[in-house]
């Protein structure tokens, strides 16, 4: 017994008069892009206190995670958003420094920069604050990883040089040694 679905057979194909969606037209190119998954992270930015001194304040940012801490630390170098600036948040960083990458050795995070051009150029409170933002974000706010200290390195001409980070508290580290958030207690709120 033969049965059919009720559509008559035709001897040859014919053109359809209905308008087809672009994706069904011959030769159409479709692109489907997976929606980006954002992750909320915290970083430290600087804020002026009522007494005129600066302190670190936690802010949240949305990033596209890549499995490393690099996109988080890049948010610090990017400085405050317009909304954050309206709330009084500032950054001592100027344009000029780029994060090359990060490496974890034990509990020490190695932060590789291409230059210090974006950092304040002296041993001032602004320079200390810049390092405090990087170091304390790394040791206090990054989740899922234990970082106790940070060593900032410069990558130039295929050479790596440790940066002597200026500190606000405690003994200055020996040349090329890592620093901890406890070296920047002055900038932490009670």
Regions found by a protein language model. Give the residues of each.
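Bimodal "functional hotspot" detector
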Residues: 1-190
